[in-house]
């Protein structure tokens, strides 16, 4: 199974991968789309197929939202705990996992977008670090020294949400990146 919106390039890693997987006996592929396209929850579509086809394993492929700038488009994450569609952008849906579907779920996720708050947070962390290396009395560092990592992130989120709402950023060469990463993932699946 594949998750994602083929109409939005950074979220199209799943649908693009499925288009490259070689369909063989006992290997099924589906790109269920998103609720706005189909009117159906991804979980409901996948659950119906699982109940009918009784697969031994599900491989769910989806784009992720990174919590660190350096991870955007640089990693392919694998897990056997499933995936929750939409959770990276605050749009939680029913999880695709063993508990909900009754069979093992391998999730392949690629961080394709980063929240604007994460960019500000990571930039501030770097600024504070650089200033602390060059200044004895770093007033910016002192402002944030009592904040936990999550409290600092929440502060930036509250400030920015007032002005720009929920904004996600992706690299400018995202089309090429999606093609390359989809090919890597599909070639790996084709070797199974």
Where do the PLM segments sit?
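Glycine-rich phosphate/diphosphate-binding loop of Rossmann-like nucleotide-binding domains
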Residues: 1, 5-29
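Gly/Ser/Thr-rich loops at beta-strand to alpha-helix junctions
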Residues: 2-11, 35-37, 63-67
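Short acidic, glycine/serine/threonine-rich loops at helix termini
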Residues: 10-15, 40-43, 69-73, 118-120
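Conserved active-site and cofactor/substrate-binding residues in soluble primary-metabolism enzymes
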Residues: 12, 16, 41-45, 53, ...
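Short, surface-exposed basic-aromatic patches at helix termini and helix-loop junctions that form
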Residues: 20-22, 47-54, 77-80
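A structural signal for small-residue-enriched, beta-sheet-centric alpha/beta enzyme cores
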Residues: 30-31, 61-192
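Catalytic-core regions of hydrolytic enzymes
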Residues: 33-58, 63-64
């Amino acid at each position: 199974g594949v998750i994602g919106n083929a109409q939005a390039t950074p979220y199209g890693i799943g649908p693009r991968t499925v288009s490259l997987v070689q369909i063989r006996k006992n290997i099924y592929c589906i790109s269920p789309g998103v609720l706005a396209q189909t009117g159906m929850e991804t979980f409901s579509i996948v659950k119906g197929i699982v109940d009918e086809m009784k697969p031994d394993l599900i491989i769910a492929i989806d784009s992720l939202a990174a919590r660190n700038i350096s991870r955007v488009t640089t990693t392919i994450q694998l897990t056997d705990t499933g995936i929750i569609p939409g959770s990276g952008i605050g749009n939680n849906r029913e999880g695709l996992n063993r508990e909900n579907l009754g069979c093992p779920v391998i999730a392949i996720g690629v961080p394709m977008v980063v929240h604007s708050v994460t960019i500000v947070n990571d930039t501030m962390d770097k600024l504070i670090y650089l200033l602390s290396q060059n200044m004895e009395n770093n007033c910016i560092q002192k402002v944030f020294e009592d904040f936990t990592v999550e409290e600092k992130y929440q502060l930036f989120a509250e400030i920015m949400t007032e002005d720009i709402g929920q904004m996600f950023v992706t690299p400018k060469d995202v089309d090429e990146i999606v093609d390359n990463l989809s090919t890597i993932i599909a070639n790996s699946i084709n070797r199974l």
